[in-house]
């Protein structure tokens, strides 16, 4: 009996086993079928959970294989670096407790201590940092306070050896001269490119208009990790751009503008020096400006006052009216008129401050800057003829002078009163570059030349010139004879006792100049503001009067303080030192050609070898760093420098302060910017004394004071 039961039990077990095996086989088959169908779907559609696998795979591969192009540098015409490349760092903290390197934890362990230490370096409170570290996220960042950290901040945090704290390096732009010509040189921001990596993109100034040349083209590596050497995937580093700006003149202009702007507490100020024969802008700046490294001062300050801001030019426009009248035979300098006021079709024109100087000749009316005189001149010309000259001098149209978003200007010319107003600079709005361009016809014997800023664009690898800036004649609105006659009348404005530009007289330095001042009212909500502190005070100069070389414009808008008895005395403190420096430089230009040195390539060499090679060529050398090989040179290889010019080399290691005796302020400031120490100055000219001895280490915390004196 028991054997029978056992046989039945075995049969039941066997039957169950077969059933389970059959079920398992069916289930496995279904699972394989489902997985197969899913894989077939993925292979066909190449999508998972709405993610495109082809794109994701390509991006992952390309991100690994991308070779980033190096952005080109920007130089001054004398070879000094104005914009360079650097690296900044984005800070992050790992909170995921599963992150280990072997047995070592790679996440933040002591959150309170980490918050305390980080708060001493980044602009975020200890409590705010701790809140981020106490979050439930696997990894956190620190907002804008943790982005774009400079090398000093990076080194400080790195030295703290904080577990779980890391950095993501990002490309950045470095501007060695900080605020110098900031609106001209411009600015970049960081954008994510097609490969998913950050790259620099120009958004202001030359960085913007020459972005295509500067940025270059990213490349890729092949599957072996080698850079592709030909075809569309080859990396092409950005080209270098050289500007027409002269770094020495620019430095002098910036320093003088700082003093003037701080002293007047003005709303804004502008100054430009242009080569009248070529149109090259040799120096230009505006206030307020900004620091492109920190972006301090940028918030409400994006407008370039050279080409984007329009204004009524005031009495500087009278010179254009004078030129038109002479050209048309309508200028009668010895004829007389009644000054003070003039009624035209129900409108009233008055001279400055409502003054009535009695009966004046038209010649005297020009040097005294009489509005009434030039209203009469416009009426003599006729509105149609006068408008023809406004167009011939290329007002109301962009100059296309290498800067972005240029304004065209505007005019009110319907009524007789408006037509008369334009003759002395009201009812017409112009840009600074338009005014300079118009005056170039007077300085350049009738030939009107376009202002320009880009000297050349060159391949950063070979040095081959890809674009060469050149003089462009945009027209000839007047004859050479007319231009010379206008310049003669402009000397009256300087030489006559009642001339409005007598403050700018350079005859004591051996130069006769031509000049015209301007006091332009500012219109708001359909009416002119009252008071000298609500005007634009300006001067336009042509130097020298005979065979001119330079045009210079200086203007200050709405000064709150008048540090001198006459605002023109204040503007002269900008004009005189810059113009005399430019004249002295041009006088020695012929000599300089024989003293030029073509810069050799010294990057990659030892400091001693590089120094020896440059000093042998007659150049002075200062080094930032003290160990390793030379990484960069301040004047690029192949460029020309004058004998005895200071060349700054950058290497590694600590920096030892050089003997700066005899250095110019510009040289000392450049070296301080490269090194990071704070330079304090007393006086002008050349360094005669320094507070720290040569050979002492300097860094970002150092303060070096220098005394300067003019050479006798």
Predicted segments — roles?
Residues 67-70, 77, 86-88, 162, ...:
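Extracytoplasmic
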Residues 38, 79, 157, 184, ...:
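Residue-level preference for non-acidic, small/hydrophobic
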Residues 69, 105-112, 147-151, 200, ...:
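Soluble non-cytosolic domains of exported or imported proteins
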Residues 83, 276-309, 323-556:
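Beta-lactam-recognizing serine transpeptidase/beta-lactamase-like catalytic domain environment
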Residues 524, 554-568, 576-712:
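Ligand-recognition elements built from short beta-strands and adjacent flexible loops
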Residues 143-160, 170-183, 459-572, 585-600, ...:
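Conserved SxxK-family serine transpeptidase/carboxypeptidase catalytic domain
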């Amino acid at each position: 009996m028991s054997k029978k039961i056992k046989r039945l039990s075995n049969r039941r077990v066997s039957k169950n086993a077969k059933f389970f095996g059959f079920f398992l086989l069916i289930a496995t088959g279904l699972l394989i079928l489902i997985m197969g169908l899913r894989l077939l779907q993925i292979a066909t559609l190449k999508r998972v959970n709405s993610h495109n696998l082809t794109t994701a795979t390509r991006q992952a591969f390309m991100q690994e294989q991308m070779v980033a192009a190096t952005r080109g540098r920007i130089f001054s015409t004398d070879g000094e670096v104005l914009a360079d490349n650097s690296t900044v760092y984005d800070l992050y903290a790992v909170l995921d407790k599963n992150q280990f390197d072997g047995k070592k934890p790679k996440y933040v362990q002591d959150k309170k201590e980490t918050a305390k230490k980080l708060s001493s370096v980044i602009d975020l409170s200890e409590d705010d940092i701790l809140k981020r570290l106490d979050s439930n996220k696997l990894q956190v960042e620190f907002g804008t306070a943790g982005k774009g950290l400079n090398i000093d901040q990076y080194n400080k945090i790195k030295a703290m050896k904080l577990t779980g704290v890391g950095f993501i390096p990002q490309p950045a732009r470095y501007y060695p001269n900080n605020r110098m010509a900031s609106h001209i040189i411009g600015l970049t921001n960081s954008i994510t490119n097609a490969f998913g990596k950050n790259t620099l993109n120009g958004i202001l100034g030359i960085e913007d208009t020459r972005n295509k040349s500067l940025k270059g083209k990213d490349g890729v590596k092949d599957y072996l990790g080698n850079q592709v050497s030909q075809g569309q995937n080859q990396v092409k580093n950005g080209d270098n751009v050289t500007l027409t700006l002269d770094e020495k003149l620019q430095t002098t202009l910036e320093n003088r503008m700082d003093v003037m702007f701080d002293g007047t507490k003005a709303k804004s100020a502008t100054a430009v020096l242009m080569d009248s024969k070529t149109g090259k802008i040799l120096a230009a700046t505006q206030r307020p400006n900004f620091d492109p490294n920190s972006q301090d001062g940028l918030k409400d300050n994006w407008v370039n006052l050279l080409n984007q801001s329009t204004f009524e030019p005031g009495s500087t426009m009278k010179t254009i009216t004078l030129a038109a009248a002479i050209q048309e035979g309508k200028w009668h300098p010895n004829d007389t008129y009644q000054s003070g006021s003039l009624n035209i079709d129900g409108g009233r024109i008055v001279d400055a401050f409502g003054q009535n100087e009695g009966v004046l000749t038209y010649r005297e009316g020009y040097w005294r800057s009489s509005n009434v005189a030039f209203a009469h001149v416009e009426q003599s010309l006729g509105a149609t003829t006068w408008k023809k000259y406004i167009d011939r001098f290329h007002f109301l149209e962009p100059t296309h002078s290498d800067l972005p978003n240029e304004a065209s200007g505007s005019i009110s010319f319907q009524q007789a009163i408006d037509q008369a107003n334009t003759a002395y600079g009201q009812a017409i709005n112009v840009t600074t570059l338009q005014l300079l361009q118009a005056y170039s016809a007077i300085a350049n014997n009738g030939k009107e030349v376009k202002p320009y800023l880009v000297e050349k664009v060159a391949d950063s690898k070979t040095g081959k010139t890809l674009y060469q800036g050149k003089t462009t004649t945009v027209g000839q609105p007047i004859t050479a004879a007319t231009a010379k006659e206008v310049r003669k009348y402009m000397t009256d404005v300087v030489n006559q006792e009642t001339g409005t530009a007598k403050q700018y007289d350079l005859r004591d330095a051996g130069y006769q100049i031509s000049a015209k001042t301007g006091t332009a009212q500012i219109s708001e909500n359909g009416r002119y503001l009252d008071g000298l502190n609500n005007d634009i005070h300006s001067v336009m100069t042509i130097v020298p009067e005979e065979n001119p070389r330079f045009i210079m414009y200086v203007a200050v808008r709405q000064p709150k303080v008048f540090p001198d008895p006459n605002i023109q005395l204040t503007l002269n403190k900008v004009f005189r030192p810059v113009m005399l420096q430019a004249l002295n430089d041009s006088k020695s230009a012929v000599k300089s050609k024989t003293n030029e040195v073509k810069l050799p390539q010294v990057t990659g060499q030892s400091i001693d070898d590089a120094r020896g090679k440059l000093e042998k060529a007659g150049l002075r050398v200062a080094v930032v760093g003290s160990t390793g090989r030379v990484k960069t040179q301040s004047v690029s290889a192949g460029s020309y420098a004058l004998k005895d010019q200071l060349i700054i080399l950058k290497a590694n290691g600590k920096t030892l302060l050089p003997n700066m005796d005899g250095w110019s302020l510009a040289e000392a400031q450049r070296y301080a910017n490269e090194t990071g120490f704070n330079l304090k100055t007393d006086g002008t000219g050349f360094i005669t004394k320094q507070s720290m001895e040569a050979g002492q280490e300097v860094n970002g915390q150092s303060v070096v004071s220098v005394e300067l004196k003019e050479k006798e």
